[in-house]
Amino acid sequence: MVFNCYPVANAEESPMSSQNPTTVAWWSVRMRATGTLDDEPYHVSGAESLVAPGMIEQTVAGLTQRALAPGHTVKARQVRVSLDQLDVEPTIIPALPTELKECPDPVAARQYFVDVLSRFVPHPAEALRVLTEGPTMRGAAMVEAGTDRRLEADPLRGVRVTKFGDLTESAPGASLAHKKHHHEAVLLASKVAAAPGVLAEFCISDDPHYTRGYVCVDGVYTTVTNVKADGDPNGGRVILVDTARADPTTITTWLENHPVLIGPATASSQKATSWHGHLCGRLNAWRAAGLERRPRTFCSAQDPDAVTTDGPALLFSSSDYLGLSTEPKVQQAMNNTVRRLGSSSGGSRLTTGTSVAHHQAEHEIAAWLGYPQAVFMASGYQANIATIQLLADPHVTVISDAENHASLIDGCRLARARTVVVPHADLDVIDTALDCVTTDRALVLTEGVYSMGGDVAPVGELVEIAHRHGALVVVDDAHGIGTVGPTGRGATEELPASQRPDVLLGTASKALGVEGGFACLDETLATLMRNCARGYVFSSAPSPVVAAGVAAAVEYLRTDTRRVCSLQANVAQARLLLAEADLIPPSAAHDRGPIIRIPVGPESRAVAAQEELARRGLMVGAIRYPAVARGDAILRICLTARHTDEHIRILVTSLREVLDGALSDAPR
């Protein structure tokens, strides 16, 4: 037996149950016992407890006795006990209240697991498989609610739950000599339930003779009987998380490294936190992570020389790429329509909400972009969700680019589709993923011009690959329509008919300078969407005033491409100068999108850069988690047709000075 020991306090100090937990120097005592099976190392036993100095001797003795107990399948040949003093104060939480779910047999027990899992994931059987098949990891699987996506960094190791102690018993050191499955599981589950972003936990023990499991959801630990037959060595754990509340790294760090002491369950612990307390806690956690946003208020149109309530600003964060929001022809069309048709649609598209203005907008969009039909809705977000929810369901596999917009991700979640996230613009991986599809149908989902970096997707090649596998292709070109292509028709303009996506999604709130979203598609899909897409059927139609503005904007671009040419010239110049200044990688110098990503790193550095640029009179977006991965914040530059050479020169000079000079000592 090997001890890794450090100097400890007098063992005659009072036991931890009589001490104030906030004034004790707590220690982590860990035991791991190993043996050999078929000449291979074999894990025999392991345990950990946080204890006060006065309980170290008892705890070491109890854990050692457990390691050497004769009941193990394999005899321990080596026992390691380590002691580490904590350098942070533990958080104290109450144990979860407990309930019992009695099931007559494993079939009924596993159906109960599936019923609860189905609240959170589209394919509960896959999560159940982690719980019931042979163990492949020592820790737990972390699964994203809504997508089934596995999030643990190391699939062999899993996510461990460590550094928690027991304040519920008077002699914890002695009690550790014998494993008490239920009590120790409640302690572990209590820490998991307190972690940020955790929604639920499911467990089936891999102990062959312990036939109970548990479900921890809604703040209650429920023991489930007869989850497997006696002698079955299989088991596992699944932790379901909401990545909108906390990212996987934050959750894992909390579970593995944040010390927690679990006290007795109290009356208050058996009740859900009040709504006010719950919402305040979420907001405070968001603020503490440096993620709170405060919008600026404009007093002018979004021209390059804009005015906000904070004063004038040189604007580089607007998606009014062509300046059509102030185009007189667009404004005149809207003014005429409000006098003729009123300011409101008055209903959904299938009741009283469709006007001649809506038909005109759809006709102009479809003809301009080369599709038989267009379906117009209130926003790009709504159009994206409605389209994906119409096309996808649990029998559809969606191959989704890793940098797709949140609206596309949310559409997959609402559709409860089997979603496979592939590396950004990686055609080989997409091809392989389509080869592995086992569902009835498949759909490939991408942006045309990516909203965070401005690079253009290889749409033509992607369509060829997808159609070879019989898959449908949906492209969201919100940032490409009006900005790229010889006449501004977007990322698909120069493609032959055989390489065009089946559905082209777009928005009128960016280059078109108005509002609304749309889907371009064939006659069959358009008719199906108008009858069955929930976002279309059950939402009020956009105002006819908006529809008239969209029709006028499209007509303008159909006959006059000078603004498109000006924008593309500005994008090329800005990318060249930014690359020469080493602010973007050389590969980004040749991207065509009007969005330019300036890598920054930590959220705090991005915010500091944004604030310093604002002091210099420039408005630039600081894009942080969850729009990008945590720790990969960017400054997002949006070019427009109305920026001048001098505007671009000021931008590049200011960025170089701020990022290379004023913030050189900021944390990275």
From Swiss-Prot:
Keywords: ATP-binding, Biotin biosynthesis, Ligase, Magnesium, Multifunctional enzyme, Nucleotide-binding, Pyridoxal phosphate, Transferase. GO terms for biological process: biotin biosynthetic process. Its cofactor is Mg(2+); pyridoxal 5'-phosphate. The modification N6-(pyridoxal phosphate)lysine is found at residue 510. InterPro entries: Aminotransferase_I/II_large (IPR004839), AON_synthase_class-II (IPR050087), BioW (IPR005499), PyrdxlP-dep_Trfase (IPR015424), PyrdxlP-dep_Trfase_major (IPR015421), PyrdxlP-dep_Trfase_small (IPR015422). It catalyses: heptanedioate + ATP + CoA = 6-carboxyhexanoyl-CoA + AMP + diphosphate; 6-carboxyhexanoyl-[ACP] + L-alanine + H(+) = (8S)-8-amino-7-oxononanoate + holo-[ACP] + CO2. Pathway: Metabolic intermediate metabolism; pimeloyl-CoA biosynthesis; pimeloyl-CoA from pimelate: step 1/1; Cofactor biosynthesis; biotin biosynthesis. Substrate binds at residues 293, 405. It holds the Pfam family Aminotran_1_2. Pyridoxal 5'-phosphate binds at residues 380-381, 451, 476-479, 507-510. It comes from the Bacteria. Its EC number is 6.2.1.14, 2.3.1.47. GO terms for molecular function: 6-carboxyhexanoate-CoA ligase activity; 8-amino-7-oxononanoate synthase activity; ATP binding; pyridoxal phosphate binding. Catalyzes both the decarboxylative condensation of pimeloyl-[acyl-carrier protein] and L-alanine to produce 8-amino-7-oxononanoate (AON), [acyl-carrier protein], and carbon dioxide, and the transformation of pimelate into pimeloyl-CoA with concomitant hydrolysis of ATP to AMP. In the N-terminal section; belongs to the BioW family. In the C-terminal section; belongs to the class-II pyridoxal-phosphate-dependent aminotransferase family. BioF subfamily. Homodimer. This is Biotin biosynthesis bifunctional protein BioWF. It comes from Cutibacterium acnes (strain SK137). The lineage of its organism: Bacteria, Bacillati, Actinomycetota, Actinomycetes, Propionibacteriales.
